């Protein structure tokens, strides 16, 4: 009986413990009171699991909050920053026009004050900055040019040349360089006075040069030269204008009866085509091997407005390809009038004679310079302005050009000057003045040789091309000189084509004199 009672009591105790545990886990009883009833291992497991779950939940919530904050900041920056930026820049932009508008007015006021001060000075002092140009060919300042120009405009009617040399020492240096055949001792280098010419008066003298006579002679000589041009075959091409796309369509068809340039009795011809005066855009046909009658049949398009066609010229240059040396120029065709055949609304076929290549026709570029002579001061100023379309002398397709000017007398070089070097360009701009002291009695006996050189740091400087001006020059060189002598104290500016130097040397500095760059006479 006692055994059964103990079993019943134990079962009741277990049921009671079970009920108490359910109440504790259900939250009906405080956990501190329940911890003393449960076994140590079970109570420890229940408390540790709860702590781990709470800490894990806190980490997840904090991470999500941080991610949400980053996303919100990024969206805010994308949407709101451009608006704020424009608002910040707007006030600064409103201030800029005021500063810009105020700056030119201050500059103009200072320039006007300087001009007024210069105009109030005597005439010799006003011309002094322009006359004192360095003989080492510096750049002419823009302020000196403007001051001199305005002074000459105001005083041109009543002001005569007032620059008088103090002594004849300047002419003595020139006298030492003259050849012995000239009787220099009998030459009077004194400077005479000239009467002031009033408005409407004209000065006539027996020795005055008349440029009309020289111009007429040069025109006649050029006309005779054109009649004597030697031909070397014919070129066939077609022209048409595309009104819709504003394109000049040029079709090079073929060439006939070309001269043989190779020792085998044939040539390897190809054609280069330009639409002058712009030489930056050019086209070239394929090379046809070993033939004197090549059939090209190639089409090229030049973008040009129809109204500008009357001022354009087509230039065809026919070359012989040489793999191992410089390509030989066979000849050229220049079409001065594009409307010679038709109005180009339809395709028009043209046959033209190919003019044989001469030294003058080789394209080496052009140079622009001005000449001005002051007879009372015995001073000649040559201003090198710029060059264009120079021949590329470096492997990079460019050049480092500078201009060298030599004062010549009967084949001897008396003096030489040069400009600065312009790096890596085929169209350099100089605006540099070069001055020579030449007495009026010796102007007819001298000439100027202008050479455009390519500077080479390692080897010799090479000659790109030369031109010459003087009474013994030909064509434009002589006309430019005569015009300078006819209009004293006035800069005369012209473009001059560069010619290849006969007996071309690698270095122009090694030559004792500048040989004449005249093209060879055609039969």
From Swiss-Prot:
Changing residue 268 to A: Loss of function. Residues 77-523 are cytoplasmic. Its cofactor is Ca(2+). InterPro entries: C2_dom (IPR000008), C2_domain_sf (IPR035892), Synaptotagmin (IPR001565). Disruption phenotype: Impaired food-finding behaviors due to defects in sensory perception of smell. Decreased number of olfactory bulb synapses in the external plexiform layer, but not the glomerular layer, of the olfactory bulb. The size and dendritic arborization of olfactory bulb neurons are decreased, but not the synapse density per dendritic length. Defects are due to impaired exocytosis of IGF1 in neurons of the olfactory bulb. Keywords: Calcium, Cytoplasmic vesicle, Disulfide bond, Exocytosis, Membrane, Metal-binding, Phosphoprotein, Repeat, Transmembrane, Transmembrane helix. Disulfide bonds: none annotated. Highly expressed in the olfactory bulb. This is Synaptotagmin-10. It comes from Mus musculus (Mouse).
């Amino acid at each position: 009986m006692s055994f059964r009672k103990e079993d019943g009591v134990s079962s009741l105790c277990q049921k009671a413990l079970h009920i108490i545990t359910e109440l504790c886990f259900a939250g009906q009883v405080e956990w501190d009171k329940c911890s003393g009833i449960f076994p140590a291992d079970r109570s420890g497991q229940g408390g540790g699991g709860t702590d781990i779950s709470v800490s894990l939940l806190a980490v997840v919530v904090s991470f999500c909050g941080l991610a949400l904050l980053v996303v919100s900041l990024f969206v805010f920056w994308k949407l709101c920053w451009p608006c704020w930026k424009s608002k910040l820049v707007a006030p600064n932009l409103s201030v800029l026009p005021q500063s810009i508008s105020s700056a030119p007015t201050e500059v103009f006021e200072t320039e006007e004050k300087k001009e007024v001060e210069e105009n109030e000075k005597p005439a010799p002092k006003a011309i002094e900055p322009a006359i004192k140009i360095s003989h080492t060919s510096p750049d002419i300042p823009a302020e000196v040019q403007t001051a001199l120009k305005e002074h000459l405009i105001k005083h041109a009617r009543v002001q005569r040349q007032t620059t008088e040399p103090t002594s004849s020492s300047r002419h003595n240096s020139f006298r030492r360089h003259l050849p012995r055949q000239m009787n220099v001792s009998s030459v009077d280098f004194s400077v005479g006075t000239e009467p002031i010419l009033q408005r409407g008066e004209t000065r006539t003298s027996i020795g005055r040069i008349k440029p009309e006579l020289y111009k007429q002679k040069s025109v006649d000589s050029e006309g005779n030269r054109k009649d004597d041009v030697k031909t070397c075959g014919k070129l066939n091409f077609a022209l048409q204008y595309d009104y819709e796309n504003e394109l000049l369509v040029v079709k090079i068809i073929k060439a006939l009866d070309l001269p043989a340039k190779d020792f085998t009795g044939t040539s390897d011809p190809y054609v280069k085509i330009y639409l002058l005066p712009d030489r930056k855009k050019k086209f070239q046909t394929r090379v046809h091997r070993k033939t004197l009658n090549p059939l090209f049949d190639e089409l090229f398009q030049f973008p040009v407005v129809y109204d500008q066609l009357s001022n354009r010229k087509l230039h065809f240059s026919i070359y012989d390809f040489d793999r191992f040396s410089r390509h030989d120029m066979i000849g050229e065709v220049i079409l001065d009038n594009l409307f010679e055949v038709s109005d180009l609304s339809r395709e028009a076929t043209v046959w033209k004679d190919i003019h044989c290549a001469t030294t003058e026709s080789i394209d080496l570029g052009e140079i622009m310079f001005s000449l001005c002579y002051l007879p009372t001061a015995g001073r000649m100023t040559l201003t090198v302005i710029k060059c264009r379309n120079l021949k590329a002398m470096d492997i990079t397709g460019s050049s480092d050009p500078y201009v060298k000017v030599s004062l010549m007398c009967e084949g001897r070089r008396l003096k030489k000057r040069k400009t600065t070097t312009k790096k890596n360009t085929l169209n350099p701009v100089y605006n540099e003045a070069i001055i020579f002291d030449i007495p009026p009695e010796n102007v007819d006996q001298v000439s100027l040789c202008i050479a455009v050189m390519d500077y080479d740091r390692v080897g010799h400087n090479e000659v790109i091309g030369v031109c010459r001006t003087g009474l013994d020059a030909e064509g434009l060189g002589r006309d430019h000189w005569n015009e300078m002598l006819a209009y004293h104290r006035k800069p005369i500016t012209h473009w001059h084509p560069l010619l290849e130097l006969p007996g071309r040397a690698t270095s122009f500095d090694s030559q004792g004199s500048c040989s004449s760059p005249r093209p060879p006479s055609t039969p």
